[in-house]
């Protein structure tokens, strides 16, 4: 499967509430390692893409207060390439773009688990 068709399959998967909830759980798990927690509804209710990105954006902003090293450690845990992160740092909507990348990377983990299990 090529990259484009995998992206399309991932986009389609984000319409499935069970898949979205598993993605939210993965996000909460990875962020929890950095003492960044989400409200109960984040773990129990499949949210819209925009709402998830908003929650993620808030947590990233909190983590940035602790310094760039902590943020890079989180991105390493999520498996978001540093090169990709650096390309976003000059963007005016940095947090929104980074949150979107985090969501898609976490969703991709769930997609691959489902595909190969």
Please give the residue ranges for each predicted region:
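Conserved phosphate/pyrophosphate-binding and hydrolysis machinery centered on Walker-type P-loop NTPases
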Residues: 13, 17, 42-49, 88-92
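Intrinsically disordered or highly flexible coil/loop and linker segments, enriched in small
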Residues: 33-37, 69, 108-116
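Amphipathic protein-protein interaction modules
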Residues: 53-97
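Membrane topogenic helices and adjacent juxtamembrane segments
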Residues: 1-41
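Short, contiguous, helix-prone interaction/anchoring segments in small proteins
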Residues: 26-66
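Amphipathic alpha-helical binding modules
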Residues: 83-117
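Hydrophobic alpha-helical segments at protein termini of multi-pass membrane proteins
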Residues: 1-14, 60, 70-73, 104, ...
């Amino acid at each position: 499967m090529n990259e484009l068709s995998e992206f399309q399959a991932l986009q389609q998967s984000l319409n499935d509430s069970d898949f979205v909830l598993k993605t939210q759980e993965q996000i909460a798990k990875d962020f929890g390692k950095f003492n960044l927690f989400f409200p109960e509804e984040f773990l129990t209710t499949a949210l819209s893409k925009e709402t998830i990105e908003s929650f993620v954006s808030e947590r990233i902003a909190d983590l940035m207060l602790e310094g760039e090293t902590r943020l890079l450690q989180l991105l390493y845990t999520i498996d978001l390439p540093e090169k990709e992160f650096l390309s976003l740092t000059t963007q005016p909507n940095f947090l929104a773009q980074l949150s979107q990348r985090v969501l898609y990377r976490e969703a991709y983990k769930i997609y691959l688990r489902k595909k190969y299990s």
